Regions:
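Conserved phosphate-binding elements of NTP-dependent enzyme cores
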Residues: 1-953
């Protein structure tokens, strides 16, 4: 076996055609080719799957039972395989407690830094907290109170509610005679208690003494006597002692723990878990460390105040039903000479407060309604309390989904979104608490960490140096992959696929592993051209540690920087799955594969000869301040192809996906998603609908497929129902569905396969032995159109189906639209779980294309080129250009220069990411923006336009 290479022999997974591939060890290798050509099948479903299988096989049979199905990929042999780590583009963690800081473990080091080197301040007085040894406390008391009468007390309760009967009894049994309650010294008596609903401060009187030497007593003897008393007080007071001057009544606190010398407030000794919002020790008690709390949103409870309550104005209650809650509301309204038919906007606020938050007195229900001999009086707690009871009492998924319609997440009023309790937020280093550091951009935090050592004391510096060095090293890896605009408190769930992938990449570089095979799926997603060089250098750094790096990628810079390229093709789907080239980038330039033709400029996506002027109308969005936006005003010219550009984190998604799109969705579809802050929008009446086409899956079960998503499967079933054989048998459309009983194969439930449980071995998926994977029973399959059964139709590729249904006008347009967006290779019945993000997006786009448009539609696409080859981009852009030619407006967020150069109008944002971004730098045609001196995008646009001009010459 050659140790210098990894060999894949006879790979046949999905559409791969028994291919052999050689990958040099310790190289940066790029797998490229058209979308659907088989790159991911080779990288993830063959190489990674086999690596995982071999790893799992080292476990015991018992352990393997818990690790799910790891069947052997369809490949003859893979030699030279190292341990494999896949870094995919999925946002894997939806847990609201997961942040950039916790994922990268930087926050763990930050917690350690604060536990060891931070200075504590009192959240009550702002004073620096102090702590003393027992000996120091005794010497300070002697110094301050020598010759004076003092009370020595042990603090027991600080500002807490309760009757404390057991505490008083316990102190009495220990022999104590006096207790101080809320500043007043009282004799301890049997059965003593306090008002349980009030906050109390309680101290037990340990001793009363005059600090003067008795007859024949030395100063040392006095000190020892005081030390015994102080030690007793500290044992009772959990490390604290309180001294009261008997003459003046002035109180002073001393403590072995951190303590406020003014108020006596005491902190526990700092430990890393005090600074964790995932620990009860550190989390804000109100929001439990989430930074947000769920509140009932009255706008969602009463979405339309023009309706009456009888018509369903109070959404959780719905329309009038003869139920107690409606009788109670009617009784309240009758006091104001109103009834359930009155529009909510006409009901006085006082009455609405009673309806929402509860009536002050019991309401009278007429005896006729409750079928009793007398009127019925009942307390009414209000709709809001009723909703809260449902929220807290119904733990079912359906119950949570129902109550979730009326809830909004708002910033916690106690910690103001900082997640930690007051004590944790009171520790500071160079004037900053841990939450303030977590809010900084990583670039800003890196600089702060570089300077902070100069502002630490000598002892602090010695403790902190190594921790700071580790934090800076980890931040540096994140900066190197273009994530300087993120902050440590950014939720993992809010990251794009590309961002979360690059975070995992940075984490792997930081782990310093060697002899590992890394497989990455398009790490350049969402990355501006400016940051591409840094990403490539990071991948090379991973390689130079002694690892092999495989990247599934379409980016030209990445291909040119690679050591080795494997080009899969020649086309996609059944026409792909072959190795059309493997070798160095220099060798590839001398071939004529489709990829090579784009790299050596034999083919190119042409810059249009002229830019559209639009229809002269526009949508104006003003005063946007969400996230990092700085009062952004923007005009979107209608009837044009608009591209929003800018470095990662500059505010593109905030402006379009989080502000504009929710505003339009609320306007047209009454969407509940709230837009980010803005002042006004004008021109919505100029469009008639908004269509958002993203890369989320078209379905999450194997039963979903392109035919069901586009709706063409309903038309196909209707066609089969209309056939003479189906009419004779009396078949209805449900007969041709694999989701309901009747026509499907009941042996496999319409899945086409069975899952065989192997107990201590992984489950095995085998084709159904009754229907042989066709999903339907024999009777259903006997109905044929042009000699093909419904199962045969689902097994057709889109290209085959276009020919097959060319004379069926109800079906052809929907299938043709799939072909038009470059998905001719997909099978109509292909499971949606096997589609890539780019394929899912194009299925959605095809679905929208097959619908009629009025020429007044706004289409919003976020990075539609993800997962697309140069030629796929050409096909996609041709489709989008046709939409604009019909009078529609297409708005794209994009980094890809092949898309940017086709724009009629560019909105460039920046200049940087995060806090240093959030501004519109330049707008206009690509030619106009290329002349701008602001930001990084103009230089790249200028370069690509000049290259296009040379290509035309």
């Amino acid at each position: 076996m050659d140790k210098d290479k990894i060999e894949v022999l006879g790979a046949r997974v999905h559409n791969l055609k028994n291919i052999d591939v050689v990958i040099p060890r310790n190289s940066l290798t790029v797998f490229t080719g058209l979308s659907g050509s088989g790159k991911s099948s080779l990288a993830f479903d063959t190489i990674y799957a086999e690596g995982q299988r071999r790893y799992i096989e080292t476990f015991s049979a018992y352990a393997r039972n818990f690790l799910g199905n790891m069947e052997r990929p369809d490949v003859d042999k893979i030699t030279g395989l190292s341990p494999v780590i896949a870094i995919e583009q999925k946002t894997t963690n939806k847990n609201p407690r997961s942040t950039v800081g916790t994922t990268t473990e930087i926050y763990d080091y930050l917690r350690l830094l604060f536990a060891r080197a931070a200075t504590a301040y009192s959240y009550q007085s702002g004073e620096k907290m102090v702590k003393y040894t027992e000996e120091k406390v005794v010497s300070m008391i002697l110094k301050d109170y020598l010759g004076k009468k003092i009370f020595i007390l042990a603090p027991l309760v600080r500002n807490r509610k309760g009757h404390y009967r057991e505490l008083f009894e316990s102190m009495r049994r220990k022999g104590y005679l006096y207790i101080r309650i809320d500043g007043e010294i009282q004799e301890l008596t049997q059965g003593m208690k306090t008002d349980r609903y009030k906050n109390h401060n309680i101290e037990v009187v340990v001793d009363k003494m005059k600090l003067a030497a008795r007859l024949g007593e030395t100063e040392d003897n006095l000190s020892q006597r005081l030390q015994k008393t102080v030690a007793t007080a500290m044992r009772q007071g959990d490390g604290q002692v309180m001294i009261i001057d008997a003459d003046t009544g002035e109180a002073k606190f001393f403590s072995k723990r951190l303590m406020d010398p003014v108020t006596g407030l005491s902190y526990k000794d700092p430990a890393p878990n005090i600074f964790s919002f995932n620990s009860p020790e550190g989390a804000c008690p109100h929001c439990k460390g989430l930074g947000m709390v769920s509140e009932i949103d009255l706008k969602k409870v009463i979405p339309d105040d023009r309706k009456s309550i009888r018509e369903g104005a109070i959404a959780p209650l719905g329309k009038y039903k003869s139920q107690m809650i409606f009788w109670q509301i009617e009784a309240i309204l009758s006091k104001y000479d109103l009834d359930l038919k009155s529009p909510v906007k006409d009901i006085p606020q006082e009455a609405m407060d009673e309806i929402l938050y509860g009536a002050l007195e019991k309401v009278r229900i007429a005896k006729e309604l409750v079928h009793t001999t007398t009127d019925y009086f009942v307390a009414f707690d209000g709709v809001v309390k009723y909703l809260r009871a449902v929220m807290e009492g119904d733990e079912s998924a359906a119950g949570k989904k129902w109550s979730g319609q009326f809830i909004a997440d708002v910033t916690c009023g106690e910690c103001h979104g900082q997640r930690l309790n007051r004590e944790a937020l009171s520790y500071k280093i160079w004037g900053k608490n841990i939450s303030e550091l977590s809010e900084m951009d990583l670039g800003e935090l890196y600089e702060w960490m570089g300077e902070v050592e100069n502002h630490l004391g000598e002892t602090q510096r010695q403790i902190a140096t190594e921790i700071i060095k580790e934090i800076r090293k980890r931040i540096r890896f994140l900066l190197d992959v273009g994530l300087d605009y993120l902050s440590l408190n950014r939720q993992s769930a809010s990251l794009s696929g590309g961002e979360s992938q690059r975070i995992r990449l940075a984490t792997q570089i930081g782990s310093q592993l060697v002899n590992v095979l890394y497989i990455l799926d398009e790490p350049s997603i969402g990355l501006h051209q400016r940051d591409n060089v840094r990403l490539i250098n990071s991948l090379k750094a991973l390689r130079d540690l002694g690892n092999t790096v495989i990247v599934v990628e379409h980016d030209e810079d990445m291909m040119r920087a690679a050591d080795w390229i494997v080009d899969i093709g020649p086309r996609a789907g059944r026409k792909g799955g072959e190795v059309v080239f493997q070798g160095t980038p220099q060798q590839m330039l001398h071939t004529h594969t489709l990829t090579a033709q784009y790299l050596n400029h034999e083919r190119a996506i042409e810059v249009p000869a002229r830019r559209r002027k639009g229809n002269g109308q526009h949508i104006a969005l003003c005063g946007c301040t969400g996230n990092n936006l700085k009062r952004v005003d923007v005009e979107l010219p209608l009837g044009e192809l608009i591209v929003v550009t800018g470095v990662s984190g500059s505010g593109k998604s905030t402006l379009i996906n989080e502000t504009l799109q929710p505003i339009l969705s609320q306007h047209f579809y009454r969407s509940l998603k709230k837009p980010m802050a803005y002042e006004k929008i004008e021109g919505m009446e100029l469009i008639d609908k908004v269509v958002t086409v993203d890369q989320s899956p078209i379905g999450r079960t194997p039963r979903s497929n392109p035919a069901t998503y586009t709706g063409v499967f309903s038309d196909i079933r209707a066609l089969f129902v209309g056939l003479p054989e189906a009419k004779i048998r009396g078949y209805k459309p449900g007969r041709f569905s694999f989701n309901v009983k009747g026509g499907r194969c009941e042996a496999c439930g319409g899945n086409g396969y069975k899952t065989i449980e192997m107990n201590f071995l992984p489950d095995v998926m085998v084709p159904c032995d009754v229907c042989h994977g066709k999903r339907y029973n024999r009777e259903t399959l006997e109905v044929r159109y042009k000699g093909k059964s419904i199962a045969d139709v689902l097994d057709m590729t889109v290209n085959m189906a276009v020919e097959f249904f060319e004379n069926v006008p109800q079906i052809l347009p929907k299938i043709k639209s799939l072909q038009d967006v470059g998905l001719g290779y997909l099978k109509l019945g292909q499971s949606s779980t096997t589609l890539s993000g780019g394929e899912s997006q194009r299925v959605k786009l095809a679905t929208e294309l097959s619908k009629r448009d009025t020429g007044k539609t706004l289409y919003i696409l976020d990075e539609p080129t993800t997962g697309l080859h140069f030629d796929d981009i050409r096909i996609l852009m041709d489709v989008l250009q046709k939409l604009v030619d019909r009078g529609n407006t297409v708005l794209i967020i994009e980094h890809n220069l092949d898309v940017i150069k086709l724009a009629d109008y560019i909105i460039d944002m920046g200049p940087e990411g995060g806090k240093r971004g959030g501004q519109v730098l330049s707008t206009g045609t690509p030619e106009a923006v290329a002349k701008s001196k602001k930001g990084f995008t103009p230089a790249f646009i200028k370069s690509v336009l000049e290259s296009a001009a040379k290509g035309r010459e």
